[in-house]
Amino acid sequence: MQPLRRLMGLVTAAPLLALVAIAAAQDANIRQPIADLEQLLAAEPLVIAQAEISRPKAKGDITLRAIVSFGEAAPLLVKLRKAEPGADTFNNVPRYDIAAYGLQKLFLDPAEYVVPPTALRMVPLADFAKYSPGVARTFSAADQVLAVVQYWLNDIKVVADVYNPERFAADPVYARHIGQLNVLTYLIRHRDSNLGNFLLGNAETGARVFSIDHGVAFASLDSDRGT
């Protein structure tokens, strides 16, 4: 029980120094106000300007790294992931991604979100097919593709494990972020440890941690990669 109490203490403690570091990290990783990004991703007219497979060496990867225009705003770099027909296949359930994004709002302030701004959009099939040959309409009644649209984080890196025990013990702000990530992934029953699902900020102290893929969560079957 003692380790759990210690972790919860780190999660809830908020000294002034920690808040300053958190604000700095917010600017480094998510460079626009959360509310503005939510409006752009969810509601403004969407036009794909350029896109490519985000991990071309990963077999079967369907996630696009895309430059997208949203209305009159400057183009944004986003993650664009198509749903398969029916929008309910293993490791590709768009409603889980939007649910994970929304759930964190119950206990985290925007400056400490561990899931970057995320929305669901319907994209015309012809537009999506330019960058994803063979893509099919998600629902038979609409000539469109349901897609997860997620803000592409800045100043981050992929590591084998975002949790570092030594850093956790020495850096209270980093420890706080790890605790917040741990709480969310527990609540949503995140069960896919695939490399790249969790990202670490590049800040030397107070680095943020993020969860960007939630296809194997909630009521999903377990991943063969483990948890």
Predicted feature residues:
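Conserved kinase catalytic-core segment
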Residues: 101, 106-111, 156, 161-224
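Regulatory N- and C-terminal appendages and interdomain linkers associated
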Residues: 22-65
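N-terminal secretory signal peptides that target proteins for export/translocation
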Residues: 1-5
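A broad structural signal for short, well-ordered beta-strand segments within beta-sheet-rich domains
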Residues: 46-52, 145, 178, 206
